[in-house]
């Protein structure tokens, strides 16, 4: 869309009676050949109304980045994420009900202060259940001024690295398995030139 159309869409979104799902529908109604794609959604904002709009708007990519961070409820609570593993999995199931072809990506942090091996196993089991198309994985690093930076942490960087390596190996395997399902098919793609460093 043109800058003028983009600005108009931004003005519409500032109105209190228009939420993000409504905005997607309004942008979808703009004439032209384009794809609607948004970068990230906090699980609290991933609603059935949003999934329905994404499914019904033919210009909207069936792609969502839904950061989970951890598959363990205690760790999620310590992170102040505002949802549980069960609630997150229910959102994923609902999104895929509306969009069976949904491409789903996520962020995961390993080694959050106090995360045990058993709690990390919950994260591994979650990614096996969800089967993300891609994951952005990180080893926790403290940020000054945050509550987590003051939490006791008995685990070493080396122990966290072992978990990280296991997570990356599982993520890569799942991603490859999912991508192989597209072999022999023809797909319309969106090339993001801002990600290409020449």
Put a short name on every predicted segment.
Residues 64-66, 135, 189-191:
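OB-fold and OB-like beta-barrel modules that bind single-stranded nucleic acids
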Residues 1, 15, 80, 112, ...:
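Pocket-edge positions in alpha/beta enzyme catalytic cores
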Residues 139, 150-195:
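Terminal RNA-binding accessory module
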Residues 90, 94, 122, 126-129, ...:
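A non-catalytic, amphipathic alpha-helix used as a structural packing/dimerization or gating element
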Residues 7-117:
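Conserved SAM/AdoMet-binding glycine-rich loop
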Residues 1-9, 13, 196-197:
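Single conserved hydrophobic/aromatic residue that forms the stacking wall/gate
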Residues 101-149, 153-154:
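N-terminal intrinsically disordered, low-complexity, charge/repeat-rich segments that act as generic
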């Amino acid at each position: 869309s043109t800058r003028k159309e983009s600005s108009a869409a931004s003005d519409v979104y500032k109105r209190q009676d228009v939420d993000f799902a409504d905005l997607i529908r309004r942008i979808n109604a703009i004439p032209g050949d384009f794809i609607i794609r948004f970068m990230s959604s906090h699980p609290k904002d991933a609603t059935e109304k949003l999934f329905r709009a994404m499914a019904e708007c033919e210009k909207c990519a069936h792609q969502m980045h839904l950061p989970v961070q951890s598959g363990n409820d205690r760790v999620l609570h310590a992170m102040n994420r505002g949802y549980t593993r069960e609630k997150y999995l229910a959102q994923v199931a609902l999104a895929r009900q509306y969009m069976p072809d949904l491409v789903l990506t996520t962020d995961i942090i390993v080694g959050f202060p106090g995360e045990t091996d058993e709690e990390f196993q919950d994260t591994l089991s979650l990614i096996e259940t969800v089967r993300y198309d891609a994951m952005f994985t990180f080893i926790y690093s403290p940020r000054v001024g945050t509550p987590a930076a003051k939490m006791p942490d008995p685990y070493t960087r080396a122990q966290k690295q072992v978990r990280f390596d296991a997570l990356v190996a599982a993520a890569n395997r799942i991603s490859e398995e999912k991508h192989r399902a597209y072999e022999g098919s023809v797909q319309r793609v969106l090339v993001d030139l801002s990600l290409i460093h020449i």
